[in-house]
């Protein structure tokens, strides 16, 4: 069980409090999702430092490569870690004809405004209702080639079976 105090902070000795007021925005009254990101940076400290900048963006939690968990914002406050929302019905191929026409022209700002009029789960979670978790690092180093999956599977199979 996760214990959360009145201020929205996790009460657990394994979670290091590193609250950055610059990333806390308005109140978050309901949580409809968890969004996991990768920082793209090499260290937790680089993210923690960036969270101190004026009008910084960041997530509620930061998990370092060694597993250290930092809480960087209250779970009772919004943290801006999500960009403009894309149309969920378009991505899931279930939009009405009228909605498809609205989304036919590429306009991220208008698409975001339309999506924000919806409630979750009819739209993706947003900054106003999602807890953000950032993992230090990136999926592949910048410039690295995307692995050939069939070849990778064959190598794994060869070594494991």
Residue ranges of model-derived segments:
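Active-site-adjacent loop/helix surface patches within enzyme catalytic domains
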Residues: 2-161
């Amino acid at each position: 069980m996760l214990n959360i105090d009145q201020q929205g902070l996790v009460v657990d000795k394994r979670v290091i409090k590193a609250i950055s007021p610059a990333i806390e925005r308005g109140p978050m009254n309901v949580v409809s999702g968890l969004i996991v990101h990768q920082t793209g940076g090499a260290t937790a400290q680089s993210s923690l430092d960036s969270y101190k900048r004026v009008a910084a963006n960041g997530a509620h939690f930061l998990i370092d490569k060694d597993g250290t968990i930092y809480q960087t914002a209250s779970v009772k406050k919004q943290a801006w870690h999500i960009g403009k929302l894309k149309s969920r019905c378009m991505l899931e191929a279930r939009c009405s004809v009228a909605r498809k026409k609205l989304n036919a022209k590429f306009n991220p700002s208008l698409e975001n405004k339309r999506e924000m009029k919806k409630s979750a789960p009819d739209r993706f979670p947003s900054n106003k209702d999602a807890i953000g978790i950032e993992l230090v690092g990136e999926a592949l180093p910048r410039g690295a080639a995307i692995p050939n999956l069939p070849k990778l599977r064959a190598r794994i199979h060869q070594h494991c079976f």
